[in-house]
Amino acid sequence: MYKQIVHAIGKAIQTLLLGLIKSYRYLISPVLMSSCRFYPSCSCYAETALKRFGVIKGSGLTVWRLLRCHPFHPGGVDFVPEKSNEMV
């Protein structure tokens, strides 16, 4: 039962975060122009990471990516890692 509750809460948070990303793309990003140093853009990376890994790991990957997106980092191609089927 707790597993179902935790899963439902995780899905709700994931939906909220994806909505925030979509809002950023349509409301803020057009004003800032293209300023991301990476491909895919940080918002696209965040969306993919959240969908692929869920809230906790996806958010961690997104934060790490955002910390590297600054004028002193060269940027480049940085895809979200593939999901491993291994049990850790």
Swiss-Prot record:
Which membrane topology describes this protein?
Answer: Peripheral membrane protein
Spell out the Pfam families in the cross-references: YidD
Report the subcellular localization.
Cell inner membrane
Q: Which InterPro entries match?
A: Membr_insert_effic_factor_YidD
One GO cellular component assignment for this chain's record is: plasma membrane
Keyword set includes Cell membrane: yes
Listed A to Z, the keywords are: Cell inner membrane, Cell membrane, Membrane
Q: What NCBIfam families does the record tag this protein with?
A: membrane protein insertion efficiency factor YidD
What protein family is recorded?
A: Belongs to the UPF0161 family.
Function (record text): Could be involved in insertion of integral membrane proteins into the membrane.
Designated name of the protein: Putative membrane protein insertion efficiency factor
* Organism of derivation: Coxiella burnetii (strain RSA 493 / Nine Mile phase I)
